[in-house]
Amino acid sequence: MIPLEKPGSGGSPSAAASGSGPGGLLTEIRTAIRTEPFQDCYSLSPGRELGRGKFAVVRKCIQKDSGKEFAAKFMRKRRKGQDCRMEIIHEIAVLELAQDNPWVINLHEVYETSSEMILVLEYAAGGEISDQCVADRDEAFNEKDVQRLMRQILEGVHFLHTHDVVHLDLKPQNILLTSESPLGDIKIVDFGLSRIVKNSEELREIMGTPEYVAPEILSYDPISMATDMWSIGVLTYVMLTGISPFLGDNKQETFLNISQMNLSYSEEEFDTVSESAVDFIKKLLVKKPEDRATAEECLKHPWLTQSSIQDPVLRVKEALEEANALQKGDSVPEISSATEKPGTEESIVTEELIVVTSYTLGQCRQSEKEKMEQKAISKRFKFEEPLLQEIPGEFIY
């Protein structure tokens, strides 16, 4: 095995990404780390950053020779007085491992200076899916969109899981789109919190983004592939409704909602969502990790295998026709128990969805019935920093 390169050592290739070190980190890479100035080969595009976190910033760049667009992720090697180069090496190794998977962002090359490492990544022009999650209803994802994108997310996650990689920070900000209009394909990004988890080993860490962490994280139980599946359940809920299911007014309340499974599948939140989609979410938002559906099982769920979904507009039209029939005293066909909507939790009525982050992304989707209940509890869609602050998380890629 060739030892990892340090700055100034020539930039020859390092070893294959097969070695696993302490704490579930990969320790070996095969990418040649380049030490010449990044600006010799790339020019940074003017305009706003693609993303920023405590220890990293992502900028759009242009390769001078080819004119191709990339995303450059500048990552500080020292964080809070600690050398975190090996965490960056791990992220590179995971990207190498997934280089042939179409649903994981592609790593182009790596540069290193005395203070930072620069990952040159595939540029996803469509941005984060969080933009659609918080959009007004006419601009948000429809269920068919979510079906297609969730199938891609699951195929990517299934690939990672078969290679013992658990992402541990799956959320709308870490799922990018190749294009916004027409709606493109997904790219899973940001493996800063990812870990290697093997069946014979136990890994316990407090990490993740509050709204998306699984109950076992909060109880300090072992992390597993099922930890990602919980996050996918939350992600699906958000993509379909624009509502963050467990969000409280603070982190403590959010964690309490997660640990006590305080969430709603009411008619108000899922008024345009199929019963099959709700069942899909319920297979994932299960407290015991061993009872959650795996990525492979999810890909076989009827919601993702059926050929079509009833048009949400048609479903709303039918509901209005039924309501009109009731007002006129006409009979309405009885709905079988197999197609009934989940019961409403009257204690929680969602009033609004507000984005809280370092900048405002604009008004989010609002419930159609928000004015009917003065004591409604707001659910806010926050872009939180991951719990493990030593590793970057609140940025694109």
UniProtKB/Swiss-Prot annotation:
Activity regulation: Inhibited by thiazolidinedione-type compounds: inhibited by furan- and pyridone- thiazolidinediones.
Active site: 169
Catalytic activity: L-seryl-[protein] + ATP = O-phospho-L-seryl-[protein] + ADP + H(+); L-threonyl-[protein] + ATP = O-phospho-L-threonyl-[protein] + ADP + H(+)
One Gene Ontology CC term in the entry: nucleus
GO BP terms, alphabetized: apoptotic process; intracellular signal transduction; positive regulation of apoptotic process; regulation of reactive oxygen species metabolic process
Pfam families listed in its UniProt record: Pkinase (PF00069)
Entry function: Acts as a positive regulator of apoptosis. May also act as a regulator of cellular reactive oxygen species.
The protein, known as: Serine/threonine-protein kinase 17A
Name of the coding gene: STK17A
